[in-house]
């Protein structure tokens, strides 16, 4: 048995502009090559675009988008009796938030547009309105577990 100390999970501090933990998670997900200032500028510009387009508080729209994109169930590979099955597993709250952030950023990068802030703003607005590629990804994840619901009994060790 390992004698190493278990490292504590570290969370980023709340964002200074919006005082939100979710916004700081978004900034760290957008971050590339340590350029945090650029990532903050992208997120702030995206939130300004959201404010102009929707006439709502961008933080409320962003939180609604995260809630809409968060999956409830995902499938994991589980080896049972010599064969591998895709077993449906419930997703914890933190993992669901991380997955939704990852999907929003992934599909905003794939969008056609001039700047990342415009693409990110459009993806957040679409996700908040229950349309777009992020919602399709969530529904696809839920559909993957539909034909194999009977395998939920093998989830004991997860």
From Swiss-Prot:
One biological-process term from Gene Ontology? translation
Which SUPFAM superfamilies does the annotation name?
A: Ribosomal protein S7
> What is the annotated localization of this protein?
Plastid, Chloroplast
**What is its biological role?**
One of the primary rRNA binding proteins, it binds directly to 16S rRNA where it nucleates assembly of the head domain of the 30S subunit.
Q: Which family does it belong to?
A: Belongs to the universal ribosomal protein uS7 family.
- Entries under PANTHER family matching the protein: RIBOSOMAL PROTEIN S7
Name of the protein described by the UniProt record: Small ribosomal subunit protein uS7c
């Amino acid at each position: 048995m390992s004698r190493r100390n278990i490292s504590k999970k570290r969370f980023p501090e709340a964002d200074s502009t919006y005082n939100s933990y979710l916004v700081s998670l978004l900034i760290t997900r957008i971050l590339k090559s340590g350029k945090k200032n650029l990532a903050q500028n992208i997120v702030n510009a995206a939130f300004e675009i959201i404010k102009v387009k929707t006439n709502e508080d961008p933080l409320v729209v962003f939180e609604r988008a995260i809630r809409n994109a968060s999956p409830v169930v995902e499938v994991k590979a589980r080896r049972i009796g010599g064969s591998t099955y895709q077993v449906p597993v419930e997703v914890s709250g933190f993992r669901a938030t991380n997955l939704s952030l990852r999907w929003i950023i992934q599909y905003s990068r794939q969008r056609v547009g001039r700047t990342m802030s415009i693409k990110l703003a459009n993806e957040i607005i679409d996700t908040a309105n229950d349309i777009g590629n992020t919602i399709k990804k969530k529904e696809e994840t839920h559909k993957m577990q539909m034909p194999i619901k009977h395998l939920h009994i093998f989830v004991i060790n997860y």
